[in-house]
């Protein structure tokens, strides 16, 4: 996502290297590069023109800041204007003073509207808001069944009257059912079409008039580029929407939709879909996306993902096990699964500042390594996972694990060596000391005469089973120790 745009923008900063300050002459080339980058990302031409004009005015009017080079100053100006372009701040979902809150979902066929409805329902559940989904798409085969299946997956009820009922009547009765059940929010999944047609728009307008939604959200496909912005504008003019949900933002998209929707339609992006899983829906934060576009990472979203995936009680238990040197392979596999719940490895790494330069090949290699590790740990017995030292001292156990996991004995030995080193390092960091120099750590595996130093103990090369006896100091001739 946005990789090509980020790389092109980086070329723009390079144009200002070695300059003392921003001037009309030296900024010209950088602005041309930014312009080319945005157009290549399929940002609307009028949006690009306005953006470049605003950046130029701010850059030429900026005061010289001591200790900040022109390139850094220019990046900050571009960042501020990107945030401004996309809407400055997150616009939350509406919430009616008196329940139920009614959210009308609209969009063309193939944009992921029905899935987005379920994703939004799950998001509301996580916010402790009860939801009811209403299936009014009576035209597309299996649309009602799809919503019911998704509802079962996320444990959210679905209201429908079958495929022969009138969509407007289904929507009306769905809202009444929500009132009867005391549900907080109603999500009405309307029919999509392959194109905008008068019949669809008239039906949507009638549903809107009857249910009087608090939010009318248009689901658009990010991969359609600036066309998504034009579609949002058309829907807003004819129906009156309050925001958009941008789907497939994790795909091979150039970013034009995210940068054009607010400016062209005047309506905010409220959520973005970042994957196929039903959990893969995030509130849209313009500042965070601007950071990612400029290769600054997105630490806040990463922290939020971690908070969702990881239980605080589990973290405390894990911390205690690290400090007590009882961290084992069961804990290690649990950590790996926590990470999987947070999303793909590539997606997580790109949220970390400075990790954007990792190639897709590097990420793929890392994902394969994680799978190999999980396969080897899965081939261990319960006793071996609880006591990794058993494997270090037993070649026969390592051979059995290698055969069971489909990997070599060398791979298993390497896993155990790296695990032992990692466990020691984690304990040292947890206790606030430095590797190899912590009081009372001599008996820890791998410590020896420094971090993983000393001669290998029983088992295999590279592993040290215990601290061993301290080496005797040789007497020096002459003055000895002064």
Curated annotation (Swiss-Prot):
Q: Give the record's keywords alphabetically.
A: Cytoplasm, GTP-binding, Hydrolase, Nucleotide-binding, Ribonucleoprotein, RNA-binding, Signal recognition particle
Q: Region entry Disordered: which residue ranges?
A: 380-413, 452-482
Tell me the GO BP annotations in alphabetical order. SRP-dependent cotranslational protein targeting to membrane
Q: Which reaction does it catalyse?
A: GTP + H2O = GDP + phosphate + H(+)
Q: Where is the composition biased (Gly residues)?
A: 452-468
Pfam families named among the record's database cross-references: SRP54 (PF00448), SRP54_N (PF02881), SRP_SPB (PF02978)
Where in or outside the cell? Cytoplasm
Q: What name does this protein carry?
A: Signal recognition particle protein
Q: State what this protein does.
A: Involved in targeting and insertion of nascent membrane proteins into the cytoplasmic membrane. Binds to the hydrophobic signal sequence of the ribosome-nascent chain (RNC) as it emerges from the ribosomes. The SRP-RNC complex is then targeted to the cytoplasmic membrane where it interacts with the SRP receptor FtsY.
State the gene name recorded for this protein: ffh
């Amino acid at each position: 996502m946005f990789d090509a745009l980020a790389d092109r923008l980086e070329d723009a900063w390079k144009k200002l290297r070695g300059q003392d300050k921003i001037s009309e002459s030296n900024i010209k080339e950088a602005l041309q590069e930014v312009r080319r980058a945005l157009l290549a990302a399929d940002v609307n031409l009028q949006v690009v023109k306005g953006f470049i004009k605003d950046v130029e005015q701010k850059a030429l009017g900026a005061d010289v800041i001591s200790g900040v080079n022109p390139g850094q100053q220019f990046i900050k100006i571009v960042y501020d204007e990107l945030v401004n372009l996309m809407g400055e701040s997150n616009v939350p979902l509406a919430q009616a003073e008196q329940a139920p809150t009614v959210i009308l979902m609209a969009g063309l066929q193939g944009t992921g509207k029905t899935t987005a409805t379920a994703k939004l329902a799950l998001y509301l559940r996580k916010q402790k808001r009860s939801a009811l989904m209403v299936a009014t798409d009576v035209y597309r085969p299996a649309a009602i069944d799809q919503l019911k299946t998704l509802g079962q997956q996320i444990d959210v009820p679905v209201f429908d009257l079958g495929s022969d009922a009138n969509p407007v009547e289904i929507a009306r009765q769905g809202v009444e059912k929500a009132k009867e059940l005391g549900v907080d929010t109603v999500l009405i999944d309307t029919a999509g079409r392959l194109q905008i047609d008068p019949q669809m728009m008239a039906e949507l307008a009638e549903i809107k008039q009857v249910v009087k939604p608090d939010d009318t959200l248009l689901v658009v496909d990010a991969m359609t580029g600036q066309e998504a912005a034009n579609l949002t504008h058309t829907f807003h003019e004819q129906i009156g929407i309050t925001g958009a949900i941008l789907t497939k933002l994790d795909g091979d998209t150039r970013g034009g939709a995210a940068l054009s929707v607010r400016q062209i339609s005047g309506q905010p992006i409220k959520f973005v879909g970042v994957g196929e899983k039903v959990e893969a829906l995030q509130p849209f934060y313009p500042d965070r996306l601007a950071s990612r576009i400029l290769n600054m990472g997105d630490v806040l979203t990463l922290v939020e993902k971690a908070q969702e995936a990881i239980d605080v009680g589990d973290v405390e238990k894990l911390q205690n096990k690290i400090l007590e040197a009882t961290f084992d392979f069961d804990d290690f596999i649990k950590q790996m699964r926590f990470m999987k719940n947070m999303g793909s490895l590539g997606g997580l790494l790109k949220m970390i500042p400075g990790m954007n330069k990792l190639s897709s090949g590097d990420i793929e290699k890392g994902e394969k390594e994680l799978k190999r590790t999980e396969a080897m740990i899965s081939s261990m017995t319960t006793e071996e996972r609880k006591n990794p030292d058993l494997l270090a001292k037993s070649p026969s156990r390592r051979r059995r694990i290698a055969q069971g996991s489909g990997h070599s004995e060398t791979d298993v030995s390497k896993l155990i060596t790296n695990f032992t080193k990692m466990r020691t390092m984690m304990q040292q960091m947890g206790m606030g000391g430095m590797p190899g120099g912590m009081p009372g750590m001599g008996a820890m595996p791998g410590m020896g005469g420094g971090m993983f130093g000393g001669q290998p103990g029983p088992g295999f090369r590279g592993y040290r089973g215990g601290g061993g006896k301290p080496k005797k100091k040789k007497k020096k001739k002459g003055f000895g120790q002064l």
